[in-house]
Amino acid sequence: MFFVRSEMSRYYCPFCSSRYQFYKNRRGCGYVFCDSFVTPDQAHAELEQTIGRKVEPIRHIKFDSGRQETLWIKNVLSIGLCAAFAEPLEATSIHTTIMQLKHFVYACLGQTQQETCNDGTVDDYNLKNGHLYDTMKDFLVAHYTCGRKDTEFWKYIDSGATSTDFVRSIHEVCKHRVPNSTLFPRQEGSAGWPLWSYVLAGTGALTSEVAEKEVMFNNDEQVGDSAYTYHIQDFDNMSKDLPDNTDYIRNM
């Protein structure tokens, strides 16, 4: 993976031959690639071809994704990047760091050492935060299951070698119906059905035909139209009194 400084541009290439590229219309631009399928020099050349100019100097950053098997051992508590690295997007690490700290402060931290560092609180912390990262892995893996097969990297992804049991089961459900929200992680901080719905629809796992069938409630068009109207009205009622983004930020 490497990052480069770039001028503002209205063009972007979100997915390249060996993984993905950050948006070009940002001040910082980069290309995340898998060195099992492309060399750093090849990735460098592809990035330059995509953005249309030479990139010098360039900074290469190597990483391995994964998490600690045990996040809390005795008096050592791993938080944030010490606990896991999922992907080179700051929002993911910020989110998981906040969730870990929130769990520790509200569910574990006591007035004494024994209240805080007992076997029960430690085991609960390790179980729930390990689950948080594992479900994050499922969510990220699903982003790549888009059926692309034009390079060796995408052929490898399409073979299912990097998929997970959860992603495979959700894709099987999507062939026949819209997955119910209860199928998705319900732990605080985990990606739930709203976020999964965008990924499944965007990658083609959930088709418009299946979604329309679900909305129609067994081909009852009247019920489907009523449900659609209800959701639109509900959205309008919630949003009409909200400030726009600029006003909200100014008043923070």
Residue ranges and their predicted role:
Residues 1-11:
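Flavin-dependent oxidoreductases
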Residues 9-12, 70-72:
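Short, flexible loop/turn motifs enriched in small residues
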Residues 51-127:
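A conserved active-site cap/scaffold subdomain adjacent to cofactor or substrate pockets
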